[in-house]
Structures are given as C-alpha cells and as structure tokens.
From Swiss-Prot:
GO molecular function list: NADH dehydrogenase activity; oxidoreductase activity, acting on NAD(P)H, quinone or similar compound as acceptor; quinone binding
Catalytic activity: a quinone + NADH + 5 H(+)(in) = a quinol + NAD(+) + 4 H(+)(out)
Gene Ontology cellular-component annotations: plasma membrane
UniProt-recorded name of the protein: NADH-quinone oxidoreductase subunit H
Membrane topology per record: Multi-pass membrane protein
GO BP, one annotated term: aerobic respiration
Transmembrane intervals: 11-31, 83-103, 123-143, 164-184, 207-227, 261-281, 299-319, 331-351, 366-386
Recorded family membership: Belongs to the complex I subunit 1 family.
Originating gene: nuoH
InterPro entries reported in the protein's UniProt record: NADH_UbQ_OxRdtase_su1/FPO (IPR001694), NADH_UbQ_OxRdtase_su1_CS (IPR018086)
Amino acid sequence: MSPLEATIDPVWLIIVKVVILFVILLAWTIFNVWFERRVLAKMQNRIGPIMNSAWAGGVFQAVGDGLKLIFKEMLTPKGADKIVFNLAPVIAGIACFASWSVIPLGGQVSMFGHTTRLQITDVPVAVLFILAVASIGIYGVVLAGWSSAGTYSLLGSLRSSAQMISYEVAMGLSLVTVFIFSGSMSTSQIVESQANHLVVGGFDTHIAGHYWLLLIPSFVIYVITMFGESNRLPFDLPECESELVSGYITEYSGFPYGMYFLAEYINMATLSAVCTTLFLGGYRAPWPLNYFGVIDSGWWGLLWFFLKTQLVIFFFVWVRAAIPRFRYDHFMDLGWKVLIPVSLGWVLLVAAWRTVINQGWGRNPVFLVVVGVILVALIVWAFMGGKTDSTADEAPDEPFDAFAGGYPVPPLPHQVQAPLAGAATATTVARRDHDENGGL
C-alpha cells in the first residue's frame, strides 16, 4: 500500500474522522487521569478516587476536575507578555493533537459505505512529521516560562527545553534502525512490515517480527527517552514541586492550565501510540492470536491498538510510582553521555549488518575471517588495554575554611579544619607573647 492511498477519502469523511478522533482523545484523557490515580492508589495501598460515583470507581472525579478548570478565573501576572502568555497553551494544545493525524489506529474498514483506513492521512515521512510536531510543542513550554515574568516559570521552561531537545536527539537516533529494517518512514508501512514472520536460521517461527524483539537496544532507548520527552517521573524536572513549585505552569490558572494538563496526558498517549506503532506491531493482533485471520483485520485492529497503547501507559504510571526523580546533572549525563553514543553505535552496527546481508558478503569466508579478527582485537583491547590511574591526577584535598563564604560552616567528616586566619591569629600571637614576657 502506498502511503498516499490514505488521502483519497472524501473531504466530509476526513472531517468525520477528525471529529471522532478528537472526541476519542478527550474521553481517553479523562479515562487515563482516572486510570493513573487508581493504579497509583493500588500501588501505594490507598483507596484512590471514589468521589461523586462510588459505583463507577471515581471516574467522574476527573470530569469534575476538567469542568472546574474550565470555569475558574484566568489570571495574568503583572508584567507578563499577555499575547505570548495566552498563545503558549494554544501551541501546546495544537501540537499534542497534530501527531495523531498520521498514526494508524487500524487497517481497512467500511465506514458510511466507503472503504477507508482507520487513519486520517499518511505521508512517506510520517515519523519525521511526528518528531517535527514534538519540536513545535517545545515552543509552548518555552514561551510559557518566558512570558510569565516569574523566576520559577523561567527556570522550569529552560529545564524543559534543554531536556526535550537533548532526549529528542536520542529518540530520533533510536528510530533510524526501524527505518533501516522497514525501508520506510511511513507509519502504515512500518506496521505492515512487522507482520512478516520471524525467520531464524532459515526456519519460519510463525512469530510476527515486531521490532521490539529484533531491535531491542532501539526499543529500550526509545522507552527511556519517551519519559524525558513527556516530562514525566522520573524525569519531571521542569515542574518538580520540591524545587520549582510547578515549573513553567506556575503562573497559569483556569482554562490555560487545563490546556497544559490535557497536553501532558495526550503527549503520554501519543508517545505510547508511537511505541505501539513502531515496535509493538501497531494494530496487528499479538502472538499467537495473529494465527486467526478473522481477528487480525478490520475493526479488530482498533481493539489491539488501544490495548497495546494502554499497556504502555500503564508502564508510565508504574514507573512514576516505583522510581524516584533523577538529579538534573545525572539526567543530562544519561542523555548525552550514554543514550546518544549508544544509539550512534547501534545505528552503525545495524547499517553494517544490513549491508552485509543485502550484498551477500556473509557467504564470503575471507570477509568472515576479517570480521572475526577485528572483533577479537576489539575484545582484547577492551579487556587488556591499559587503564589510566584515576587517582593520579586528583588534586590533594585543601584544608576546609569555614569562613570562606563569610558565614561559619561546619566541616564535613572528611574535611580538615584550616587554621584560624586574620584577626583571630594575630590576637592569639599577641596573647602568647604577652604571657612569655611576664605580662609586660
């Protein structure tokens, strides 16, 4: 199927799809708010939300929160740039919805007498479009902090921009191997390419070749980076309450605050949907249900897609309840010093492997011998290479001066107290001389 075949629908059908998708996302957000609260309560041995409807498990509490934010007064801080301050939530809201236009929710179905796909549209660079929209969403965060005329808001927006840009690089690199294996950046074609059976040693396993299984390092890197992109625990540094009150949304209230609240949960669902599409087989039935063709086509794809995506959302909630917040320097070191180098090395390795397979070099014994020698040399160098003495260049510990900053600070257990200096030393010397001279 060509990626552009999904754009031949009548205009009225495209509008219907957009409206239905918009309603689904709003309802799904309400469900995910309730779902997160209930899961956190169960993991923390609490009751959780039961307000308004004990029989419904408290699901209407999320509805009440949304209505409350809609009707609350919208305040603008004194000194804020009013135009940019009000525009920032709109940018964040539009960006979180736009990515869903290229995410396939299912295969071909019959809708109002027309055969169509459960996807608004598809383009040859659909995944690149999703990454571009995510970059636009950063402006909604940066402009919110810059226009609020508040210290906490500005610091939160700067943290968020640095965090999202840093982890977007690693996320993009983790997806390159998916493009290499599928041969396309179209979301629908990537899903279809995962329907091929996994072949091991010439034996057909009849297991769908999902990329989470074939490209495990890429899958792990994407899962880590999606937490950084969504500003969720353990990477919620832009709005951590213990340091920045509420970060870049500190000065917002009412409907604009609700827009950021909505954008956070839709972004979480978007990243989960992208994970489902690129690594978990999309709307295809999981193994071994894929043996039954009846439940692996048509409207059944909608069920499998939402079940897989909800499973990833549950992982979001589980990590929030189980893992504490990272320190900022550790978080940035993880992105720049670990994830990006590992992603680059993995991309080179996968590209080289695909080249060897496509060119048929794997059958050449000379090539295999050369590769074996190189691998052995690398292993020997890694384990037998000279190691630098990490303690050789360390500077000796200097005596601790408790009055260096102007205030007395008690030394830590491993620090050495410096001798008294200045007036105190002079006074001590004068008293000693006075005692030695017999008081003269």
